[in-house]
Amino acid sequence: MTKIKICGITRESETEMLNRMQVDYAGFVFFEKSKRNVSIEQAKEIKKHLKPSIKTVAVTVNPALDLIDEIIEAGFDILQIHKMQEFHENLKIPVWVAYQVRNREEAEEINVPDGISGILLDAPEYGSGKTFSWQDFPMKKRREWQERRIPFILAGGLSSENVEEGIRLFEPDVVDVSSSVEGEHGKDYKKVEAFVRKVREHE
């Protein structure tokens, strides 16, 4: 069964819909240039209201070790790293490494380090609402990760309109959505509900 991650949680009120819909992961962004950026303290307060069954993901961009230590101390379940410069082994937290897919050539050069807990594929531009070119992606890479039993997270431009196609093509372990389920004031209940329904209808 494909699991669901709702990313970019910024308000306590959003936890109610995640709890009600029994999603699997809630993502909190720790990157100042993002409009969804929150502080560690804000995230700690918000995540108190999530059901224990919902795992929390700390989303970062090439984080300093000090930030990683804060994330671990705050009790997050998973560390997600974009633009990783160096993979630090022996971190006391599972790590998802995110790669932006710009073209087929770059995708073919993705080398996933040993010891990570998941690989996430994202669009060339964060939060653009656009997918990377699914049809151009070298599926031999996907099969390689399956053989290595590395959990795979599909992100970047997913919506209730295209998530079924993404699941059919990639057979991801997790689908990750953010911008397409937002309204004027954060996450929109009906949009989140529509996305969750499409994922579960596909099973």
Please provide the spans of the model-predicted regions:
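Conserved N-terminal beta1-alpha1 strand-loop-helix module at the mouth
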Residues: 1-203
